[in-house]
Amino acid sequence: MVKFYDREFGSRLLIGSALYPSPAIMQDSIRESGAEIVTVSLRRETAGGKAGDQFWSLIRELGVTVLPNTAGCRGVRDAVTTAKLARELFATSWIKLEVIADNDTLQPDVVGLVEAAQILIKDGFEVFPYCTEDLSVAMRLVDAGCRVVMPWAAPIGSARGITNRDALKLLRDRLPDITLVVDAGLGAPSHAAEAMELGYDAVLLNTAIAKAEDPVAMARGFKLAIEAGRTGFEAGLMGARDFASPSTPVIGTPFWHAVS
């Protein structure tokens, strides 16, 4: 089980709802992933009108928990306003907080992110902040009241996997009581397994599944990889070595020498 604020979930995979080839494939992919939390963008999905009604109907049919996000917001005021609208629409205090600094890299504006988190937490929100892998930023978010932190592995949609393993490991080591979710930049199931082997509590995926040749099959692949990575972490991974170490010990006399 993984805990997000005061709620527990069985799946360690959070999944996005954008970019799929069709609404039906989106539904099937989410089901196959086993995800219980689905992120939705207030700015990029139409909440009203015929298309919006169809989209929300499909999400409701899945019986999942909706995590609204502030994707596309470029400043503190924009992010805070969007979060408040999301709370009214979805009747939830949860918000995946994104404050973007640059359109080319979609890198988080970490200064604005911390400020927006402080404002929203004081207003009763439970914030899921999308941030870089910088420890000082993560600690400021925790000090602001965030009990979940979501560092990127690489820029959104890049599919590069974990580019700064040491920094992500440091976050896990220094924030043992915080729910940590790798968010953005994963492109293959092996990337998700690596994140879980580092001890991360969950991963959030969208593009890697939605843009696969077979999104439904890829959703299952990520589900299995996350389970495998978490199992490996809990089992206790052996440490890496600089030199070889024999797997079969040499003890006593070879058995063929012992035969008279």
UniProtKB/Swiss-Prot annotation:
It holds the Pfam family ThiG. It is found in: Cytoplasm. GO terms for cellular component: cytoplasm. Its main location: cytoplasm. Pathway: Cofactor biosynthesis; thiamine diphosphate biosynthesis. It comes from the Bacteria. GO terms for biological process: thiamine diphosphate biosynthetic process. GO terms for molecular function: thiazole synthase activity. 1-deoxy-D-xylulose 5-phosphate binds at G157, A184, G185, N206, T207. It catalyses: [ThiS sulfur-carrier protein]-C-terminal-Gly-aminoethanethioate + 2-iminoacetate + 1-deoxy-D-xylulose 5-phosphate = [ThiS sulfur-carrier protein]-C-terminal Gly-Gly + 2-[(2R,5Z)-2-carboxy-4-methylthiazol-5(2H)-ylidene]ethyl phosphate + 2 H2O + H(+). Keywords: Cytoplasm, Schiff base, Thiamine biosynthesis, Transferase. The keyword Transferase applies. Its EC number is 2.8.1.10. The active site is at K96 (schiff-base intermediate with dxp). Belongs to the ThiG family. Catalyzes the rearrangement of 1-deoxy-D-xylulose 5-phosphate (DXP) to produce the thiazole phosphate moiety of thiamine. Sulfur is provided by the thiocarboxylate moiety of the carrier protein ThiS. In vitro, sulfur can be provided by H(2)S. HAMAP family: ThiG. Homotetramer. Forms heterodimers with either ThiH or ThiS. PANTHER family: THIAZOLE SYNTHASE. This is Thiazole synthase. It comes from Rhodopseudomonas palustris (strain ATCC BAA-98 / CGA009). The gene is thiG.
